Regions:
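Helix-rich, typically C-terminal accessory recognition domains appended to large enzymatic cores
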Residues: 19, 36-37, 69-216
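Alpha-helical recognition segments enriched in aromatics with Gly/Pro capping
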Residues: 1-91
């Protein structure tokens, strides 16, 4: 047996089953039955979504947020974006309906950008640099679980698109590809509407490092 590549769980796991699992692996290692002293290569603890009152959600406190209700009102993609945007992955964060609505406005803006599609692009060198920087940033952030900063980068790109009079289908498709891991439903639907094959079957965009810095 080899080590588990990635173990993800809350801090409550540390003094419960994880403690005993590690004990057994140490024992098996000592008697020569497994090749590694530890059972995990990487251990990550995720934060907890707290209630709006900054306390742990509890029915007795009346501060529980039902995700089914959120999905019905705002959609699964908005909930997914908000949960990733709340803060550092490993830190607790209180629920904020105002911030959730902000994520809904972000998704609405992405949808409205489709109305700007035109063969005459408002392309500039600074936009090309921003696109390449965004791809590079998202690759790094996704790998290092920086989901909140990943979404911030996408918001900057969306705002840049929104300031243009028009954007090409290729530029819009790039945005949809980058947003797809976070909001798969709306991006696949928009992608189909502009005539492309499924994003989930496409190659991830490749950035040009030489174009991540604007010429002066």
């Amino acid at each position: 047996w080899n080590r588990v590549d990635w173990y993800n769980g809350g801090m409550e796991h540390t003094a419960r089953h994880l403690l005993y699992a590690r004990f057994w692996v140490q024992f098996l290692y000592n008697i020569g039955l497994v090749p590694n002293k530890e059972m995990i290569w990487t251990r990550v603890s995720h934060g907890m979504v707290l209630g709006p009152d900054n306390q742990k959600m509890s029915k007795s406190k009346g501060n529980v947020i039902n995700p089914d209700d959120i999905v019905k009102e705002y959609g699964a993609d908005v909930l997914r974006i908000y949960e990733m945007f709340m803060g550092d992955y490993q830190m607790d964060a209180p629920w904020s309906t105002d911030s959730l609505r902000g994520c809904k406005r972000f998704v609405d803006k992405v949808v409205r950008l489709k109305d700007k599609l035109n063969e005459k692009s408002g392309f500039t060198e600074s936009l090309e640099v921003l696109q390449n920087k965004t791809i590079m940033k998202i690759e790094y952030d996704m790998t290092h679980m920086g989901y909140n900063t990943c979404i911030s980068s996408l918001m900057i790109l969306v705002n840049a698109y929104d300031e243009l009079d028009s954007i090409t289908k290729e530029d819009y498709r790039l945005l949809l590809q980058l947003l797809n891991p976070i909001a798969p439903h709306v991006t696949e639907e928009l992608n189909e509407m502009i005539g492309y094959s499924p994003i989930c079957e496409s190659e991830w965009p490749v950035y040009d490092e030489a174009k991540t810095v604007e010429n002066t």
